[in-house]
A protein has these predicted regions:
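Shared catalytic-loop signature of beta/alpha-barrel
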Residues: 1-68, 72
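Extended hydrophobic packing segments that form well-structured cores
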Residues: 69-98
């Protein structure tokens, strides 16, 4: 829809590396991509939750070349920080709240 109206898009990398990987992949495939926006480079927990962290170089994200979204979840880390309906589960600090 945006492309047909000559509008550019700027996906936000705000919800962790799996959502970010989806936005990175779509950004490499569309002609009206402008910029990826992120508040960080997915260090700490967001790097640990992937078997191979997303790479950044000079402020640019390097699109993964592995199949699918290009990322593989580290299930041990994910299970150690399992979601529960009582606590906020966002990374805006060193470790997610759980």
């Amino acid at each position: 829809m945006a492309e047909s109206h000559y509008a550019q898009i700027a996906p936000h990398l705000y919800c962790g590396p799996v959502e970010g990987a989806a936005n990175i992949q779509i950004s490499t495939c569309i002609p009206n991509f402008l910029i990826l926006e992120s508040i960080g480079r997915w260090k700490g927990f967001h790097a640990q939750i992937l078997k191979k962290p997303v790479e950044w170089e000079s402020g640019f994200v390097i699109p993964p070349t592995e199949p699918g979204l290009g990322v593989e979840l580290n299930e041990e880390v994910a299970l150690a920080h399992a979601y529960n309906e009582k606590d906020l589960h966002l990374e805006m600090a060193e470790k997610p709240f759980y």
